[in-house]
């Protein structure tokens, strides 16, 4: 019986910890693009039980680029973003993300990057896009302007 447990002990304990949106201490989502008018980065971070929001974005040629850092946001605003993370199961998606084996670089292509920092210091990164998350982040950015 011990011989059967040994392989399980050696190989079965590599499961990733299951995190929830309550474990998030920072989230960042960005789009890089060759077009300066269609790029953005949003970051929400928790410090001493308060939430702070950074944004740097532009969506068209007619409106100026918006940039700000460390805007204090309400717990409700932070909760709306974390709810989108929870509803879309973005933490698990990011944990399951595997970068492509073939490294191809397209000069005019954009890239989407999602980053989480958890309360225990674990960092989770993925190149994934989620429209719902973009919408709640953009809504908060417009509110903070």
What are these regions (language model features)?
Residues 57-93:
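A short-motif feature that recognizes glycine-rich, charge-decorated loops
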Residues 46-50, 87, 109-112:
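Solvent-exposed, well-ordered amphipathic alpha-helical segments
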Residues 18, 42-43, 47, 76-83, ...:
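Polar/charged alpha-helical tracts
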Residues 13-63:
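N-terminal export/targeting and maturation segments
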Residues 41-45, 67-76, 121-131:
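Short amphipathic beta-strand/extended segments with alternating polar/hydrophobic composition
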